[in-house]
Amino acid sequence: MDPKTQQLRDRVKRFAIRVVRFVRTLPQTVDGQEIGRQLLRAGTGVSANYHATGRSRSRAEFVAKLGVVLEEADEAEHWVDVLHQANIGRGDDLQWLRDEAAQLRAIFRQSVKTARANHARTSARR
């Protein structure tokens, strides 16, 4: 595995772990717990689905799986923003999650764009 891929894999795993720890700190209210569950699913989904891209059997499958990672990153960012706007959760941890979710979404948006272009170029050569 190339070093950049491993670095990103480690980064998304760190994000998932921070999400898990953050969700544990949310208030035991209906809104805190429900939004926390949504964030937990999306935040850990970024890591799990990125890990799954390494098992892609084709370029098309890789592009599709990377698209799922982007969707999960986008959703995680959404739920973090909801928590922020609803004033639920601790400041520093929440701010780190907001920043990291936005950065991961941007990384995966560009990755999907690049992977699609590479796939189209490869498909056109055949």
Kindly label every feature range from the protein language model.
Residues 1-126:
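Amphipathic alpha-helical assembly/interaction segments
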